[in-house]
Each structure stands twice: as structure tokens, then as C-alpha cells.
Design a protein with these regions (language model features):
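A cross-kingdom feature that marks ATP-driven nucleic-acid transaction machinery
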Residues: 297-472
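Phosphate-binding site recognition
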Residues: 1-334
Length: 472
């Protein structure tokens, strides 16, 4: 698969390269493309790339010496038995002293597991050997908890050394769609499953129908993604069963903290740490209405599975593991036939629309400078009054309210009228008193002529078809 997006991340890395001494920490969940980003960055630079593995420290030093030997084209280095990391780092510092070099240590947490003192060793190497010798250091790792503890935390020996950090997230829909040769509907449905995780996307690049790709990659016992959530959680947490229970409860439609607790038959105080960890890992998101002025302390929070594939897995795979173990994949395909597009994809489409809106604003195709993009729902009744896309432009005192329709029919005036009614809620008008309201309708299937005519006469009504502003 070709390299996609990551413009901002590459800009950060190139800016750090221009510094006197850049120390960058890159972290993020597995499969998200950290190594691919690094290799794209170093492809035209003098770079030492070392991938740590689960091996003894002596073996790691021997392999690192091999990297140094091949990069410097000095075969003698691979024959030396190094016993001190400082000596290895000195080779990097001495290589082409007048040329900027990049040293990458990928899967850094494995070195810490082998030797807990490695962060202190690296701190000493950076301070005494690397920092003032034209070296840019990149530490990378997938074990988010360990990267935070050993590379970013206040009590880490490396604290204060980093000059930048990148938490790599899945690709946005707009970046993925721009690089694909797919129809909008095909792209949305694929993204609803992969969530923009590059490794997952690799398995959905064929011309075969999506349902066959799902059967082969996800539903087959031998499929790459059949047990993916197990692998992800087992690497990051010590009691995966508790985290599984939380994810299952949320996937079953329990989004309030109290409901999650009731489903698990536990006090909310007991499950809060699990939710916090799942949020840190990027598997769960805590949403609050756009009206909340202090989101972190809001009592109106709702929790959702933010990882599209994990949401798909808990909806269509986990409940049918017994049947799938017996190679009965048809039962899942029948279940998908009931609501995959109407509910599962339609839900993912809402977050896709928020991304599309942000991108259209960034490009200047919508005259709006969002300070915050989210959604809104009535504070009493979960799901009663819901606005899919809600954004605030505090600079110009404007409020954007959008409705997303993922169905085959063109959107009609009735949808606009209903959105206007929602926009007059007492809570919204009180929270954004004096703000001008701009309405937006998102559709994959276009709009009726009557609605198009109405939008032509109303500058505060914006129609977005697929990923572009609709203009008559």
C-alpha cells in the first residue's frame, strides 16, 4: 500500500531535523503506521535504524553493531563484541561528524523490558555523546503505557530531553478517500471497518466484494484479524477480561457510566480506571455535548468504542465466536445483512462527516473557523435530541449544526426543518447566546430540488454531498 497522508507529522520531523539536536518520541497503538512513517522520513537521509525485539541485551547489542556496520560500511564493527551501550552510541556520533544523522530506536519498550536501566543509559548517552554531535534521535514504541512511563513521564530519566512528541493516530477518512480508487460509498463502508488503521487497510485492497474480504480477513479462523482485539489488549493490560467486559458493555449500547456499571454489576468507581486506560489506548472515547464549558468535569459524558474495527468485532464477531469456530460464517453475514449499512456504517458516517467538515473548513470551502467540533444531545434523555455534527466558531460567534443521512434517498426539506427545531433547544440557545447558527446537511445520495433551491437562497444552509460542498 502506498504511503498516505501524515503531512503534519512529516513536517514536525523535518523541523526537528533542522534543530541543533532533536529528540522525538513517536508512540501509538500497533498497526497504526509508526514504522512506515519513520521509514518515509529517513528514506533520503543518513540514518541508523534499529528495531528492538524480545532478546537478551547482549543479542541486542550485537544486532545494533550489525546496523552500525552496514550503515557505516565498516565490516569490522560487526566483529567487535560490545558490552557498553555508550560505545555503540559513540560510533553513531563519530560517523560523518559534519553531516546530520538520524538514529531510530524502534520498539524501545523491548529494551526497557530487557534492562530496566536502559532509559538512564540512554539519558547519559544523549547528554554526553549524541546531543552535540549532529544526531537526531527518534524513540518509537507501540506499548503506549510503557512509552508514557519510560519516555514521557515526569519521573523518567529521559524527561526533559525530548524536543517533540508525536502520538500517531489512525488516518483520517479524507486522507484515505483521496488516495483510493473507490466510490464514496465503498470508501465509507471500508473505513467503517478499518478505521483508517493502515495495517488493516492492507487487507482490504483487493477488487473482491467487501463481504468476501470480511469473510477472508475477519471471520475465518485463520484470518489476520480474527483475534485482533485479544492480541491488542493482551499486550497492553494485565487483566484483559475486565477490559473486554467494558468494551462489550459499551458495544451493546451502554454509553452512560452508570449503565456500564449496571451491566457489569460493578460500582462505577471500579470501572473508571478501566475506562481511563481504554481511552489512553485509543479504543474508547469520552464524548460530552458541545454545550459543556468544562468537558473534563462534565457529568453528561457518554462513552463509545472509538476504534472502528474493535466496534465491528464486538458487534459481529464476538457474539458468534462459537459458530465461527465451527466455520459457520454465514450466521455473521446474515446478521450483517440486518443492519450493517443502516446502523453500523451510518454511525461511523457521523464521525466521517465531522472529519469532512473540518477538512472543508481548513480548505476554506466552508467559511467557518472551528474552535471545537463534536456533537450535541439533550442532557436529560440520551439519544432523544441528537445533533450529529456540532461545531463552534468562537472568534466569529457562530454555531454550526449538522445532520448526517446515510441512506439511498436524496435528503429533503423535512430533514432541514427537523434540524432547525433541534437548534432551538433551550440549552443550545442559552449556551451560545448571540451566536449565529449555520445549518449543514450531509448526504451520500444528494438532495431534492426543493432543498437545493432553498439552500441557494440561504447562506446559512450548507449542503455537503459526499466529501464536497454541493453547488447547483
Amino acid at each position: 500500500m502506498d504511503f498516505i497522508g501524515r503531512t503534519s507529522e512529516l513536517a514536525t520531523l523535518n523541523a526537528e531535523l533542522e534543530r541543533g539536536s532533536g529528540f522525538v518520541v513517536i508512540y501509538g497503538r500497533r498497526r497504526v503506521g509508526k514504522t512506515t512513517l519513520i521509514k518515509e522520513f529517513i528514506k533520503d537521509k543518513r540514518a541508523f535504524y534499529f528495531l528492538a525485539t524480545t532478546e537478551s541485551e547482549a543479542q541486542s547489542m550485537k544486532r545494533f553493531a550489525g546496523v552500525l556496520s552496514r550503515t557505516t560500511k565498516n565490516p569490522m564493527l560487526s566483529k567487535v563484541t560490545f558490552t557498553d551501550w555508550l560505545d555503540l552510541f559513540q560510533v553513531v556520533a563519530d560517523d560523518h561528524p559534519d553531516e546530520k544523522k538520524v538514529l531510530v530506536i524502534d520498539e524501545f519498550p523491548y529494551l526497557v523490558k530487557t534492562n530496566p536501566d536502559f532509559p538512564s543509559i540512554l539519558q547519559n548517552a544523549w547528554d554526553e555523546v549524541l546531543k552535540d554531535h549532529n544526531v537526531m534521535l527518534i524513540l518509537c514504541g507501540s506499548l503506549i503505557s510503557m512509552m508514557k512511563k519510560h519516555a514521557l513521564a515526569y519521573d523518567s530519566p529521559l524527561y526533559g530531553r525530548r524536543t517533540a512528541q508525536i502520538r500517531l493516530m489512525p488516518l483520517q477518512f479524507t486522507d484515505v478517500y483521496a488516495a483510493q480508487n473507490l466510490s464514496f460509498e465503498q470508501a465509507v463502508e471500508q473505513y467503517a471497518i478499518t478505521g483508517g488503521v493502515p495495517k488493516y487497510m492492507e487487507f482490504f485492497q483487493t477488487d473482491e466484494p467487501l463481504v468476501e474480504q470480511i469473510r477472508r480477513v475477519v471471520l475465518s479462523k485463520n484470518g489476520f484479524l480474527y483475534e485482533e482485539p485479544d492480541f491488542l489488549l493482551n499486550e497492553e493490560v494485565q487483566t484483559p477480561i475486565n477490559y473486554f467486559s467494558v468494551l462489550k458493555a459499551i458495544s451493546d449500547g451502554n454509553h452512560k457510566l452508570s449503565k456500564i456499571g449496571m451491566t457489569m454489576e460493578q460500582d462505577t468507581s471500579a470501572i473508571t480506571p478501566y475506562l481511563k486506560t481504554l481511552i489512553d489506548l485509543g479504543f474508547v472515547i469520552k464524548n460530552v455535548p458541545i454545550t459543556e464549558k468544562n468537558p473534563e468535569r462534565s457529568r453528561k459524558s457518554l462513552y463509545y468504542v472509538s476504534d472502528n474495527f474493535i466496534r465491528f468485532w464486538f458487534r459481529y464477531v464476538y457474539p458468534f465466536k462459537g459458530e465461527l469456530e465451527l466455520d459457520n460464517q454465514q450466521i455473521v453475514l446474515d446478521e450483517m445483512g440486518k443492519d450493517f449499512k443502516q446502523k453500523f456504517v451510518a454511525f461511523a458516517y457521523e464521525s466521517i462527516c465531522r472529519n469532512i467538515f473540518a477538512e472543508l473548513c481548513r480548505k476554506g470551502q466552508i467559511d467557518f473557523e472551528p474552535s471545537r467540533i463534536g456533537s450535541y444531545w439533550c442532557n436529560d434523555n440520551e439519544g432523544d435530541t441528537e445533533i450529529d455534527v456540532a461545531a463552534v466558531d468562537n472568534q466569529h460567534k457562530r454555531l454550526f449544526l449538522g445532520e448526517c443521512k446515510y441512506h439511498a434517498k436524496p435528503v429533503d426539506v423535512a430533514v432541514y426543518s427537523a434540524l432547525q427545531e433541534k437548534g432551538q433547544s433551550k440549552e443550545l440557545t442559552a449556551a451560545f447566546k448571540g451566536y449565529e447558527i449555520v445549518y449543514g446537511l450531509f448526504s451520500k445520495s444528494g438532495f431534492t430540488d426543493r432543498l437545493v433551491e432553498m439552500a441557494a437562497e440561504n447562506s446559512n444552509l450548507i449542503l455537503i454531498q459526499e466529501d464536497a460542498v454541493y453547488r447547483k
